Structures are given as structure tokens and as C-alpha cells.
Amino acid sequence: SLRVVDGDTIVLNGEKIRFSGIDTPELKQTCMNGDEKVFCGKSAKMLLIKKIGNETPECISEGRDAYKRTLAECFVNGESLSAFLVRSGYAFAYRKYSDKFIKDEEFAKENKLGMWSMKFQYPWDFRKI
């Protein structure tokens, strides 16, 4: 069984998995697209749901985080979901923990994809409010 919690967390067969090395906006977090308020956290979740489709992600565990969630990189048809989300502009490379997805982030930024075409707050700043 699979449930997508948000843009960077899934529950796979009862195990809560947090994608390592990336950070997506919180579900209640908004971005500004011109004058329009966009729920970019929900957009990230929807993009992930669409990307997974009817597939079952294969996850490579990298240990646990402070919240006892499994940290992992998950793949669908051989493609990293983390890299996909960052490259689409709906997740950020979590530089504090990993430099793995910086190139994907630079690609999204250069091409103004996803949140890079909007005004946004980094999720780690948003959570401090």
C-alpha cells in the first residue's frame, strides 16, 4: 500500500519514508505567481502523486531522521523521485544535508521551472514562523 503524505514524504507498506537530500514546501505553504496565491506545497504533492501513478516506488534506505522516519531515495522505473521533484522546481536541494541534487536545482532555477517562476519562501524558513 502507498500513500503520499506530501511532496517529500510517503507511507509505503506502513513505513513512513522521508525523501533524503530534498525539501518541499509544507502543504499549507503558498507561493506568489504574480498576484495569484498558489499552494505550492499541494502542487508538489500532486506532482509526486501523478509521477508515481500506479507504480510502486523502490526505496533505498539511508537510515532514520530525528523523527524516526526512514530517510531514503525512492525510484519509479529507475528514475529518482527526488531528482525529478527538484528538477521540476517543486523541491529544493537540502544543502544542509546533501549536495546530491544541486545540479537539478540549478537546472530548474535557470529555466524558471515550478517555484522558480514565483515568489517563494524556502520551506526551512517557513517552518520557523
Residue spans of the language-model regions?
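Small beta-barrel nucleic-acid-binding modules, primarily SNase/OB-fold domains
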Residues: S1-I129
